[in-house]
Design a protein with these regions (language model features):
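Extreme N-terminal basic, low-complexity initiation segments
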Residues: 2-6
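Catalytic cores of the polymerase beta-like nucleotidyltransferase superfamily
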Residues: 8-298
Length: 298
């Protein structure tokens, strides 16, 4: 049954890709890459949401070679566009006159030091680049070169995991989360946002690596928490319950985590569990208001 759905979704996706409003952009980028004798792909969230039939305006292009050189020529061919180059990271972004932004990066492999989530990068293959992605559903790519235009490259079964509504990492989850602990928050955010389940091994790896969230800046943590806060009702309650169950909340907002009186002496059946009561208040409020600061106050 899931396989049938996956097959239907795959052919529907290809049809949608050919009809997408960004088709001319993709064709243009593919032609530039062909002229430079480089392979290029649209990757990540755009591909995921194309399959899920969800809107996504984030266009990320991976070039096996220099992403900057393709971006520069793309800018030259589009009048009134602006080009931003980040040479240190080998990335570039072109903002078109209609405000569509396309980001370019050269395919790369990454390695990490234990005390930092900032990777050491070196040029790599498409597979290297897909291996460094956080989850299989974000590791898919669609080729833009003319001879393979529209071909899906899915080495880790991202389409299948979408069909099974499952969040799983493309490599050992313990390594994935130890290398970049922010991915643990992203994992919960995607699970809540998409209504997916987290793979058991992936879930266990979050618990085992929860303490590693301490090496992530508070600013980056707040960005992810605020994205979870944008959910509503039971989804929002589920998000914070998952943060608590994985012990991430214990390291991020220990005061909130300590509100859970489950199993604490003197609280059995005598008092309302303040933590889960607070989650219910938060969920109810989120159905009435999108004000993120009002939600935090709850």
């Amino acid at each position: 049954y899931p396989l049938i759905l996956i097959t239907i979704n795959f052919f529907y996706m290809i049809d949608k890709f050919i009809r997408t409003q960004y088709l001319d952009i993709f064709k243009q980028i593919g032609n530039i890459a062909d002229n430079q004798k480089l392979d290029c792909y649209v990757v990540g969230g755009f591909v995921r949401d194309l399959i899920l039939d969800k809107p996504n305006d984030d266009i990320d292009i991976v070039v096996v070679g220099s992403g900057i050189s393709v971006a520069e020529e793309f800018k030259n061919q589009n009048k009134n566009s602006t080009l931003s180059i980040f040479a240190r990271y080998g990335t570039a972004a072109v903002k078109l006159s209609n405000n569509i932004e396309v980001e370019f990066v050269g395919a790369r492999s990454e390695s990490y030091n234990k005390n930092s989530r900032k990777p050491n990068c070196k040029p790599g293959t498409l597979r290297d680049d897909q291996l460094r992605r956080d989850f299989t559903i974000n590791a898919m790519a669609i080729c833009l070169n003319n001879d393979r235009f529209g071909e899906l490259v899915d080495p880790f079964g991202g389409v299948k995991d979408l069909g099974n509504r499952r969040i799983v990492t493309p490599t050992d989850p313990k390594i994935t989360f130890s290398d970049d602990p922010l991915r643990m928050l992203r994992c919960i955010r995607f699970a809540v946002k998409l209504g997916f389940e987290i793979d058991p091994n992936t879930w266990s790896a979050i618990i085992d690596n929860s303490y590693r969230i301490n090496i992530v800046s508070r600013e980056r943590i707040m960005v992810e928490l605020n994205k979870i806060m944008q959910c509503k009702g039971l989804d929002l309650q589920r998000g914070f319950s998952m943060l608590h169950s994985t012990r991430l909340l214990e390291y991020i907002i220990p005061e909130l985590s300590r509100l859970d009186t489950t199993g604490k002496e003197g609280y059995e059946r005598k008092h309302k569990n303040i933590f889960y009561h607070s989650l219910k208040v938060l969920g109810n409020l989120s159905e009435l208001s999108d004000n993120i600061w009002l939600k935090w106050a709850a």
